[in-house]
C-alpha cells in the first residue's frame, strides 16, 4: 500500500506542470530546485504577465555596456515556464565580456546598431558573426560567448533564454575578481604575476 501511495504521489509531482496553466512566483518564499512556490491564482493579475525592457540600461561603467534582466526574480510570471529574457545595451566600444550561462541556451536579436557576437565550442572552434538590426544568433548552453559593439553608435539587443534562471559566469570576473592567490591564478592561466595583480586591481580581486 505504501508503495502504491508513493507511486501515485510521484506521478502527481511529475504531471504537475500539465495541470497548472501558470505558476507566478511567490518571491517571498524560498526558491527550490523546482522553482518558487506559486502565488494563489485568485491573487494573480494581468499585469503580473507584463514586463518592460523599453528603457536603455546605464552603460557608464568599465565595460560600457548594460544588461537589464527579465529573469524570474524580476519577472515572476516566468516561474516554471522554462524561459527568460534580457535587454543588452552597448555604447560605442562596449562589450559583454566572455561569459557562460550554465543553465540555458541563448538567442540574441539585434534591435539597433551593429554587434559582433561569437562563441567557442567545446572543441575550441570559434564562431563569430557581425549582426545587423533584425538578425538573430543562437549561443548553445554552457559555451563561452561574447558581444561587442562593432559600430560608432549605441547598439541594443534583446536576448531570450531556455530557462527562467539561466545563470551567469563572466570569465574575467571569475578569474580576477576573486580571492584566489595571484600565484595560483598565474600558475593556472600562464599569465605573469604582475599581469594578474593588475587585472585583480582593475576588477576588484584580492590575493
UniProtKB/Swiss-Prot annotation:
Pfam families xref list: Cupin_1
Compartment(s): Secreted, Extracellular space, Apoplast
InterPro entries: Cupin_1, Germin, Germin_Mn-BS, RmlC-like_jellyroll, RmlC_Cupin_sf
Statement: the UniProt record of this protein carries the keyword Nucleotide-binding: no
Annotated S-S bridges: 23-38
Top-rank taxon: Eukaryota
GO molecular function, one term: manganese ion binding
GO cellular component: apoplast
Domain Cupin type-1: 51-197
Cleavable signal peptide: 1-17
Keywords of this entry: Apoplast, Disulfide bond, Glycoprotein, Manganese, Metal-binding, Secreted, Signal
Residues with glycosylation annotation: 58
Major location category of this protein: secreted
SUPFAM superfamilies per UniProt: RmlC-like cupins
Protein residues bound to Mn(2+): 99, 101, 106, 145
PANTHER family referenced in this protein's UniProt entry, alphabetically: GERMIN-LIKE PROTEIN SUBFAMILY 3 MEMBER 3 (PTHR31238)
Subunit structure: Oligomer (believed to be a pentamer but probably hexamer).
Protein family: Belongs to the germin family.
Main function: May play a role in plant defense. Probably has no oxalate oxidase activity even if the active site is conserved.
Protein name: Germin-like protein 1
Gene encoding the protein: GER1
Amino acid at each position: 500500500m505504501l508503495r502504491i501511495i508513493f507511486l501515485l504521489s510521484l506521478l502527481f509531482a511529475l504531471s504537475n506542470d500539465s495541470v497548472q496553466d501558470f505558476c507566478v512566483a511567490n518571491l517571498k518564499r524560498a526558491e527550490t530546485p523546482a522553482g518558487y512556490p506559486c502565488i494563489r491564482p485568485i491573487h494573480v493579475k494581468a499585469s503580473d504577465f507584463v514586463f518592460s525592457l523599453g528603457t536603455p540600461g546605464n552603460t557608464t561603467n568599465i565595460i560600457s555596456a548594460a544588461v537589464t534582466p527579465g529573469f524570474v526574480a524580476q519577472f515572476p510570471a516566468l516561474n516554471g515556464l522554462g524561459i527568460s529574457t534580457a535587454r543588452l545595451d552597448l555604447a560605442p566600444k562596449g562589450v559583454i565580456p566572455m561569459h557562460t550561462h550554465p543553465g540555458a541556451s541563448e538567442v540574441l536579436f539585434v534591435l539597433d546598431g551593429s554587434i559582433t557576437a561569437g562563441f567557442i565550442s567545446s572543441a575550441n572552434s570559434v564562431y563569430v558573426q557581425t549582426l545587423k538590426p533584425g538578425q538573430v544568433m543562437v549561443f548553445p548552453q554552457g559555451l563561452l560567448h561574447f558581444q561587442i559593439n562593432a559600430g560608432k553608435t549605441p547598439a541594443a539587443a534583446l536576448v531570450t533564454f531556455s530557462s527562467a534562471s539561466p545563470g551567469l559566469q563572466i570569465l574575467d570576473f571569475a578569474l580576477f575578481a576573486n580571492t584566489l592567490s595571484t600565484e595560483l591564478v598565474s600558475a593556472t592561466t600562464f599569465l605573469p604575476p604582475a599581469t594578474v595583480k593588475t587585472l585583480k586591481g582593475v576588477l576588484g580581486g584580492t590575493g
